[in-house]
């Protein structure tokens, strides 16, 4: 019989329910988590044994949204869900990041977490619900896992922190921050902000971590009631003899190698050392004994980590010779590509980004159909990380999870300074091509995007820059590193990325690999990051200190006019015939909004003027008594239809063609013939009565010479 176990608790303004034991009983663990009608079903399956030769931890997080959750049927030919959307990929990464550090070192059994959104309240985002569910399912499973974690979203509305704000509340919030952590430590932060201070951001992190303790407590209580026995797993005992031998062979040489400042040269030397160590050990092996290269790789990595970390903690120069708070050399160039609307090449040490900005019309905006509803995105940010950027070969194709995640982070860094649509009615696409990478290419993308946008003439509110910080901590001793290299990222305890302007922070991302990161350490890191950010902004401002006064000659110029909403149908025409003909005739792009706003986009100013003139003709009111030049469009037995200004058509009755009786209309008029017509009447239905006879008489009278005056 089914025996569900349920826990309910209040979490901010929402009620959260955790339920297990009802579904998916063949999975290692399963839990249904709901928060005010948004429900996510999360399962965990773990392999009891690791695959032979497995040298990494194969954790897979799948997050999937089902359209039935919102009472909808999927679009597309097959009418079913397909590959993960960008949003699903980003939430999968959000779940993964705080969970991965909590699995013990040496645990390489395959683990898969699947989170399926099965019901959605449009006001409650499923991401926090899915994170809570993944934490609960792993805690229930008995798999070696040092959790649970809690997760919270924090908003900042009217100078107050708000726990798990609704979607409507987020629209007026200056902050959208997600924080996850254990009972004692923050592990992950992801956020975007509207130029908030370091203290405000840190306060939000602390607030979110404090509030999520209720989640951790309730998961612990659920585990006591329904948890499976903890797996009897122990890490393999270290091979002390091999450790000592490898250390003797490699430590001093690796220490010297990590003084080589050039990345490629350093890597070549490290590869040579590893090859020499393998050769030496193989020569010492007894015949028939095989060398475990995975184990050897782990030992060498531990030695490298110790070499770099001990040097930093001792106050010695870093791998490339810098002090802890030094930024690598900067090279900033704008306008590097002649035909793009805006471009920049941003180089920081061995990290380089070629960034472009392209302006388009509203038609170029991305329509996104999400579970939470449809929305239109006018600012697109795409990040590409080709294999040549790190001197490797590899597959080139659709973006991978990492590229999607880095692109979103860089976009968050710039979003707060983008102009409003009513001030700058363009769709903007930024593309960052990473041409070299050795640490923090996403933050180089933020800097490059700011430069390219200003080069394109986009009136951003302020220049923004980004910086990646690192941390090395042993006991109470810690050092915060500015502008970390790739090696410092891998061998350190924290990856901490901050983007912002001189005024405040626009994006903060934090991934912490250890416990014990205190508020004071985060404060030091944020303040040090501010100094680095201001330094980079100073160098950027020497290249370009304000948006260009005009957009590129190759960019479409958008001209806006207003027409009466009643006239929209006239400009569009039957089945779009009029607007289609207008765009072809003028070579422009024309978009009409429901309030009568008309936007004409053209790269040629004369074409735009022509389009505006034609629209004004079409929407002009017809004046009774006025004479127009018209063109015969149809001939019928009882008269002829004549098109006058603005594509409007009126009827010339057979009695109004000439000043004598007309038996046959075609005796007087031909298709396409241009004739003067006078407007006799416009009835309530908008039908127009015209007269050629009166127009001709009036024209002749005006042209006749005046009679001589009597003497």
Swiss-Prot record:
The KH domain, residue ranges: 556-615
**InterPro entries from the xrefs?**
ExoRNase_PH_dom1, ExoRNase_PH_dom2, ExoRNase_PH_dom2_sf, KH_dom, KH_dom_type_1, KH_dom_type_1_sf, NA-bd_OB-fold, PNPase
Task: Provide an example Pfam family for this protein.
Answer: RNase_PH_C
Q: Which reaction does it catalyse?
A: RNA(n+1) + phosphate = RNA(n) + a ribonucleoside 5'-diphosphate
Listed GO CC annotations? cytosol
Q: What is its main location?
A: cytoplasm
The record's CDD domains line, in alphabetical order, gives: KH-I_PNPase (cd02393), RNase_PH_PNPase_1 (cd11363), RNase_PH_PNPase_2 (cd11364), S1_PNPase (cd04472)
Q: Which residues form the S1 motif domain?
A: 625-693
The cellular location(s) given in this protein's UniProt record come to: Cytoplasm
Keywords for the protein's UniProt record, in alphabetical order: Cytoplasm, Magnesium, Metal-binding, Nucleotidyltransferase, RNA-binding, Transferase
Q: Which PROSITE patterns match?
A: KH_TYPE_1, S1
- Can you provide one Gene Ontology molecular function annotated for this UniProt record? RNA binding
Question: What EC number(s) are associated with this protein in UniProt?
Answer: 2.7.7.8
- State the SUPFAM superfamilies in the record: Eukaryotic type KH-domain (KH-domain type I), Nucleic acid-binding proteins, Polynucleotide phosphorylase/guanosine pentaphosphate synthase (PNPase/GPSI), domain 3, Ribonuclease PH domain 2-like, Ribosomal protein S5 domain 2-like
HAMAP family, per database record: PNPase
Quaternary arrangement and interactors, per the entry? Component of the RNA degradosome, which is a multiprotein complex involved in RNA processing and mRNA degradation.
Q: Which family does it belong to?
A: Belongs to the polyribonucleotide nucleotidyltransferase family.
Q: Any idea what job this protein has?
A: Involved in mRNA degradation. Catalyzes the phosphorolysis of single-stranded polyribonucleotides processively in the 3'- to 5'-direction.
Under which name does UniProt file this protein?
A: Polyribonucleotide nucleotidyltransferase
Q: Which gene encodes it?
A: pnp
